[in-house]
Amino acid sequence: MKLAVIYHSETGNTRKAAEFVRAGMEKVEGVEARAFSIDAVDEAFVSEAGGVIFGAPTYYAFASWQMVQFLQTTKLPLTDKLGAAFSTANFEQGGSEIVLENINDMLLAKGLLVFSGGVSHGMPMTHLGANAFAAGTSIEARQSVLEALGEKFAKKAVQLF
C-alpha cells in the first residue's frame, strides 16, 4: 500500500519531522511511504496512495499560509483517503495543537477520513496528530512521537484499505 506525507518547511524542522513520520509508516509490512514538499508533490504517487499525512510549521498559532493555500487549492484526488496531521513549533504553548485542528478541519472539508490515534493505542498519544517542539532541543527529541503517528496511521490504512 502506498502512503504519502506532504509537508511545508521553512527551516528544515518540518521536513525532518516528515521523514520521521514516513519512517514510522514504513515499519508496517507492505507499506511504501514517500514524503513530499508541497513544492514537489508526485501527483501520480499521491493519487494511488490510500492515505496522506500533512505537516506544517506553526506561525502565530496557525498552520503556515503555504500549507493552507496548498490544501485550499490542490486538485489532488484526496476524497475518501485516510488523512492525518502533524505540526512543528518553536514553543510548546505556541499553538501547535491548533495547527493540528486547522489541518484536520481542512481534511474533513476535502472529504478525507481523519485518523485519530486516540488514547486507547497507548503512549505516545497521537489523538489529534503529532506535534514537535524545537525550543531548547531538537526535532529529533520528538522522533518517537512522529514515528508513532506514522506507524499507527499505516496500520489503520492497511486495515481499512
Give a label for each model feature:
Residues K2-L3, K16, F20-F161:
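FMN-binding flavodoxin-like domain, especially the glycine-rich phosphate-binding loop
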